[in-house]
Amino acid sequence: ENSNKNAYVASTQRDLIAGEVSKDLTKRILLPEKITKAHEDGVLHFHDMDYFIQPIFNCCLINIGDMLDNGTVMNGKLIESPKSFQVACTVMTQIISAVASSQYGGQSVDTRHLGKYLRKSADKYRKHYTERYAGKIAPDIIEEFVKERVNDELRSGVQTIQYQINTLMTTNGQSPFVTLFLNLDPKDEYIKENAMIIEEILRQRLEGIKNEKGVYVTPAFPKLIYVLDEHNALKGGEYDYITKLAVRCSAKRMYPDYISAKKMRENYEGNVFSPMGCRSFLVPWKDEN
């Protein structure tokens, strides 16, 4: 069985019972007899019988940028575009949970879509302090206040992501199987903010998360994938310091895994993107033209 599922938990037991019903109906009714026999004889393995009776899919890439920027609807409620980094992190984890409850495989989120919301938080704090202390405090002091508040919100937001993913339960009886794609795109106007976010994600993963006994352990999720490019490949690039942190993190916590942006561009027509959850990559879509 899936080792991510704790069979002592009531919600997981319900999922496992439903899975056995699905397997039975799949073998007896849905599959051709020769496929069922081949599966039983070990000639082949028919995957995911425990979900086959439902019209749901396996893995996906979440279009998190569109859902955050333009808002989305969950449970019949409109979720508007966030006005701060903390709220963006919370909304993102709710989307992850909703997606995990509607499929049975992994999912991936590109964290670079969070950068603009960290800047929104900075702009909000800067406006607040400027209006409150204009002419009373030097601009550089105001910037120190802004930096302190932004760093606090950054830590809290990333902690929200880590705690939510590791504590939320979904309808398939486990925490969301999710990958965070850590990509510093040189063309991204929010690359500075995203560098801060990725660095904080790595720092918190390096620290680990406390178990029920208060001991720091390595969380199973989110899986982390770190993209290596010219500016962070330990060749004197601007973001080499983040890569060095990533290597320390991998040595202690097994993640992140690494992807070469150069090879991705060669193999996928100039595109750099995450696998869906763990290892399956989509191919570039083309129509008949």
Question: Language-model features: where?
Answer:
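Conserved catalytic cores of very large enzyme subunits
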Residues: 1-289
